[in-house]
Each structure stands twice: as C-alpha cells, then as structure tokens.
C-alpha cells in the first residue's frame, strides 16, 4: 500500500461474530490477531492505521449488539495502535438514544478525539445520531458523496449518510467544516448521474 502511495491504512473489525465471519471470513478474535500484525508493521513503516468497528448497534444476522461488545473490539484496536476508531452503524438502526448509551460506555475508556461516527441512513436518523455524537464531543464523521455506499453482507441497508447533508447541518449549527460547498455540489451532481438518481 505504501509503495502505491497510500499514506494510511484501515482495518475492519466487527462487534458481531456472525457479521465478522460473513464480511471478512474470520472470527472477531481472528481478525484482531491479524490486525495486530498489520498495526505492528504499519508502525515500523510510519503509516497510521484507522480501525473500524461494524455493527455497533445491531447486526443483520444476530440482532441487537451490546455496548460491551463494541467496547471490547474498540479498545483492542486502540491498544494495538489504531490512531482512530470509526464506529459503524452498518445497517442504520441507530437512534439518538442508542448512540447516547453506546458513547457513554465508549467514552469511559477511549477519549472523544479518537472516535469517529459512521452512520448509514437506512431509516433517516443519521443526522440526529450525528447531533447526539457532537453533544458528546465527537468531531469526525464518515460520509459519502450522494449517500453512495452499502455492504453486500448488510441486506437492505442504505449507503453512508450523504456528505452534503452533513455539511449543511454542521454549517447551520455553527460548525466550520473546511469543505468547499460548490465543489461538493458538483461532486454530488456527478455521483447522482452515475447512480442514475434524480437530483
């Protein structure tokens, strides 16, 4: 990856055993063992690693996921050297109440500056979940141009929350994003054309 010009790598873990096996073809423990080797090698090469935890609220196969399960995986990733942990609501089931309970647990063991939010907009609640995360001190959020994305092992789940919607909400609420709104609009229109969506 470094030879190809990548200046950061990502590792994808899951708080759900079944989703881990479906998505990356190994157990949670097996994935963490692999990622420890990745983090060790990345540290030697001076390459930062970002950790992702899927299914932080619910799993499409197992149902509800406990905050304790999420904390176990997230803290393992931090201990092995991940610079930041992105908490992924893979199937978009999160509500603000879910996010509050989870962050109350996570922030006991990991500081907010090492946490990012990753919300899918399956049920139209992602912006509310971001607002709740902001109240808890989270300042980094994943999004995608035009709301594109998804996962073949998360049936029915929509893509990530749309970048332009997140930026509009943040600006309205007084946050600075550093994002060029005009360039973002062009990128969004381009993506909607590719996906065959009406603007």
Region spans (language model):
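Catalytic cores and adjacent flexible loops of soluble metabolic enzymes
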Residues: 2-199
């Amino acid at each position: 990856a470094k030879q190809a010009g990548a200046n950061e790598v990502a590792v994808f873990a899951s708080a759900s055993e079944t989703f881990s096996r479906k998505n990356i073809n190994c157990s949670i423990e097996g994935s963490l063992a692999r990622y420890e080797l990745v983090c060790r090698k990345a540290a030697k090469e001076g390459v930062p690693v970002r950790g992702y935890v899927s299914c932080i609220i619910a799993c499409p196969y197992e149902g509800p996921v406990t905050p304790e399960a999420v904390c176990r995986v997230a803290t393992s990733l931090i201990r092995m050297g991940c610079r930041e942990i992105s908490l992924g609501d893979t199937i978009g089931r999160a509500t603000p109440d879910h996010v509050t309970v989870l962050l109350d647990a996570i922030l006991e063991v990991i500081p907010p500056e090492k946490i990012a939010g990753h919300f899918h907009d399956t049920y139209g609640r992602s912006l509310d979940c971001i607002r709740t995360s902001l109240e808890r001190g989270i300042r980094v959020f994943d999004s995608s141009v035009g709301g594109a994305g998804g996962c073949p092992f998360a049936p029915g789940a929509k893509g990530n929350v749309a970048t332009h919607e997140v930026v509009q909400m943040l600006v309205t609420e007084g946050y600075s994003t550093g994002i060029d709104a005009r360039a973002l609009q062009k990128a969004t229109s381009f993506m909607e054309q590719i996906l065959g969506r009406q603007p």
